[in-house]
Amino acid sequence: MVCTEERNMIMANGTKFSTGNHPVEMGLPMLHFINAGFDIEIVTPTGGSAKIEMWAMPEKDDAVLKLYRDYADAFENPGSLTDFAANSMTDDAPYIAVFLPGGHGAMLGLPDNPDLGKLLHWAHNRDLFTLAICHGPAALLAANKGEPSAYIYHGYKIAAFPDAVDRQTPLIGYMPGHMPWQFGEKLNELGVTIINSKADNSCHLDRRLISGASPKAANNFGRLAASTLLDVVRSR
């Protein structure tokens, strides 16, 4: 699971928005993976602590709260994606998927990270799954090598948080300014189609890429991803 280690997004008007990975979009899928018997290894670009949008923590969800207590040390002391890319991407590595959790923090330090680009290409070439929810698909941009037709997700369809909804968030007071850039627009330019127009519970499976649209999709996304991964394990 690749988390962000950056806290502040600089908005188009120069203000700062405190962000990170969204606790529901990350936590609910994690619970499904753990209940299905999978281990989760957490990394950030350099091994700095994973940043979480604690203001979005579901304070009445005991299972999610326990998850974050249990994984507190792993979030505070994650592995380094740089080290992982250098040492762990072997033919016999025991991984089945790469998880890119949501939160606006997924747009910070990941979309242009060369080590994440290597990881996504490695996973794609080994037929591993890639899982991304809400703003997590922004990190898929790391796999871009410059030619849209050669982009590994060219022609794919995904569910993701729509740019049009992000443009509305300052109007309702959710964010202090407009987004500095639109990740959906950049994915569209690379040949990716976003299937949903609302921040709803849409989930989508296209080949080995599983995606979800928003926090509303987190439970169904986690269920779809976990069941799909289990089907692969059982078929081996």
Task: Annotate each PLM feature.
Residues 132-137:
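Short, thiol/selenol-centered motifs that function as redox-active sites or metal-ligating centers
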Residues 129:
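Active-site cofactor/cluster-binding pocket
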Residues 1-126, 139-236:
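Extended, subdomain-level signal for the structured scaffold at the beginning of enzyme domains
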